[in-house]
Each structure stands twice: as structure tokens, then as C-alpha cells.
């Protein structure tokens, strides 16, 4: 217990420090073309970005435009800050194409369909704690990185399944996104997008999902490896949808377990988010799957969601973003309340042997 508390103190301290260990710049770096070029070279070194000579000059111009956006935004009186992260020499169009949804070829894959029975197990919850953080409760694994693969849906799904499994078994097990990318192909499309609800159903029907160590992530689609996926580690009993456009209902769900959600993550402020409570410009054009792992309120009274992303630990607040909660629009900020869903696990039981499908027996 003491060790867990110490670990959380260390994590909390690093969250307070925010961008202390990340790439930073100063006004003197903006003084001349030469100093800007030096800044770009330092940024490339920090993020180990390799560019050919011809490409470097083109990317330098993109970098300068992004730098000025970050610089000018940070001078404004906003409750969040931006930074020059690993996306700093990508145009917003390029960023959106790779990380925020242009690979979701069919919008219905994120919009989904209503659950037939409309069940919501937390409907009768009457009170919730003022704040919840499933990281503190040991229900969240280390931040992961989807790379240049549109597999955010798989990462969102896995966060929720890892969370409910820890809640039911008191054991935190890192699960395999790659299994979903390679094998869940009936409705989902690997690196070209997918829907968390369909992934929950895949895991239920298959009888479980294997571990990350057994089937590690490769940031690209491959052939489904039956020898790995049959080694089941964690099972679920299904999933439910949170009532759409209802942040109060979403709060009840998150108070009890991590929840998968879809958002619009394609804006420039989201691209370069660093710290604080994000209130930035965004739409309800859902293009990115993430997971809510808690909520809270700042000292000035701003309510927020704690959202786990899949762009690595250097993005945002060590891989997380706090997004404003309880806004006037029913859809929530960036559409966060439009399509929430979560896995159901009724007991602490998990698979004890390999799964064998009819195809395996032929």
C-alpha cells in the first residue's frame, strides 16, 4: 500500500510539472530565421525526426507556422497551454489524416446503432464522488502509442476492458490492441478505423482477449495469429451504451468504471495540447476513440473529464488530456457525450484455457 501511495505521489508531482521534461522554446528563439532554424533542428533531435534535405525546408515552413500558433495561443488567457510536440512539422491536414479520422472511411462506424434493449446499469445511481481517478485506483495501464495506424478504437476498447477487469479481479493486465487490429474484421477495419462497441462484441463472442505481451502491438495490420489469440486472458460478458448526449449519465458510468468515448480530436489546439483544462475549438464530427478514466473539478470550479489518449506519454499531460465537463451543449465538448460505451463483467472469473472456434476444429 505504501509503495502504491509513493508511486502516485511521484506521478502527481510529474503531472504538476507538466511540460518540464518536454521540448520548450523562448522568445529569443523566434528572433531570426537562423534562430528558428536552430530551434527546428533541436526539435528534430529531441523527437528523433529524420528528414531529407529537400523535405527539411518544406517541413521547416510548416514548423514555423505551427510554432506561431502555439506561441500566440499560449499568450491568450486560456485555461490550457500548447506545446511543440512530435506533430510540430505536420500540417493540420496531415495530422487529421493520420491521427484523427480520415481513415474512418464510413462515418457509421463511429456513429453505430442504438442498443436494442437500451439497458444502462447505472441509471438508478443517485450520488457519485466529487472526483474519481481510476489511475489512482490501479485500474489503468501505462500510456500507449498507436503510431501511424488508425487503431484508436482498439486502444479505447482495451482501456475500458483492462479497467473493468482490474475492478472485478484486483489484477491489472495489459491487453492486446494488435489482436483487435488483426482479427476483429467483421465490422472493424484495423488501421482504417473501427467502433468500440463492435470490438466489445468481438471480445465477448470470442470468449476473451489475450495479453499485450503475448500479442504485442506493431502499428500495422497483419494476419490474425490463431496461435496467440487462442491464449485468452480476460473475458467480458457484453457491453452497454451510456444514454447519448447526457453528461450526467456519463458521470454515473465513469464513477464506476473507465468508459470508451469518441470525440473530435482534429483541431490544431488538440493537436498541440500540453496541459490544463481543454476548452478549445472542436466540433461534434467524431473522428477519434479515447477513454475517460476519471473526472474532477479545478480549484476555480471548472469541471473536467480525465481522458486517456493513445499518442504516447509525451503528448498532453503525460498522455492524458483534461477536457471541460458539463458544458451547455448536450453533446459535450468535442462530442464526448455522444457515443459512450463500456464493457460488462459480472464476476472475477477469467478464461482458464485456450479458446477453440469451429474453424479451428475443421
Curated annotation (Swiss-Prot):
- Signal sequence extent: 1-20
Subunit notes for this chain? Monomer.
Q: Please name the source species.
A: Phaseolus vulgaris
Q: Which residues are glycosylated?
A: 326, 346
Biological process, per Gene Ontology: proteolysis
Q: Which GO terms describe its molecular function?
A: cysteine-type peptidase activity
Report what the protein is called: Vignain
Against Pfam families, the record matches this protein to: Inhibitor_I29, Peptidase_C1
Q: Which family does it belong to?
A: Belongs to the peptidase C1 family.
Subcellular location(s) of the protein: Endoplasmic reticulum lumen
